[in-house]
UniProtKB/Swiss-Prot annotation:
InterPro entries: Ribosomal_uS7, Ribosomal_uS7_bac/org-type, Ribosomal_uS7_CS, Ribosomal_uS7_dom, Ribosomal_uS7_dom_sf. GO terms for biological process: translation. GO terms for molecular function: rRNA binding; structural constituent of ribosome; tRNA binding. This is Small ribosomal subunit protein uS7. SUPFAM superfamilies: Ribosomal protein S7. One of the primary rRNA binding proteins, it binds directly to 16S rRNA where it nucleates assembly of the head domain of the 30S subunit. Is located at the subunit interface close to the decoding center, probably blocks exit of the E-site tRNA. It comes from Nitratidesulfovibrio vulgaris (strain ATCC 29579 / DSM 644 / CCUG 34227 / NCIMB 8303 / VKM B-1760 / Hildenborough). The keyword Membrane does not apply. PROSITE patterns: RIBOSOMAL_S7.
Length: 156
């Protein structure tokens, strides 16, 4: 194993339209097979639709949707004396964003609408209004952490 130390993290450049790193990260997660142009087209169209339906600025609406999906607690498996406990932990801010992006994309892909633009805009609108699959996932995660609060002393 190489001993040169940790590999430096690559800096993600902000996207050209909104000049936002968050948008750039979302587009990168949305992308399939290196087709960034297609991912950008899908995302920007979905954001325009979201802005029309909410009547807010597109970037502000997107950020609010992300904020509504961010988990604050999660459970991690921890082995103690042959038993595995689900230990509730606080989620680091960078992981909160990563999980929310991942969940929004996953739940928009599994929706029933036709075309990714309508799926994504519908999921973002639901997240903006505090409902939908991604918000439900966040609530389930919080519920799991709450149910396993008794094991919080195993935190490391």
């Amino acid at each position: 194993m190489p001993r040169k130390g940790p590999v430096p993290r690559r800096e993600i450049l902000p996207d050209p339209l909104y000049n936002s790193r968050l948008v750039a990260r979302f587009i990168n997660r949305l992308m399939y097979d290196g087709k960034k142009g297609a991912a950008e087209k899908i995302f920007y169209s979905a954001l325009d639709t979201l802005a029309q339906k909410t009547g807010e600025e597109p970037l502000k609406a997107f950020e609010k949707a992300i904020e509504n999906v961010k988990p604050h607690l999660e459970v991690k498996a921890r082995r103690v004396g042959g038993a595995t406990y689900q230990v509730p932990m606080e989620v680091r801010p960078d992981r909160q964003v990563s999980l929310s992006l991942r969940w929004l994309i996953a739940y928009s892909r599994s929706r029933g609408e036709k075309g990714m633009v309508s799926k994504l805009s519908a999921e973002l609108l639901d997240a903006f209004n505090n409902r939908g699959g991604a918000v439900k996932k966040k609530e389930d995660t919080h519920r799991m952490a709450e149910a396993n609060k008794a094991f919080a002393h195993y935190r490391w």
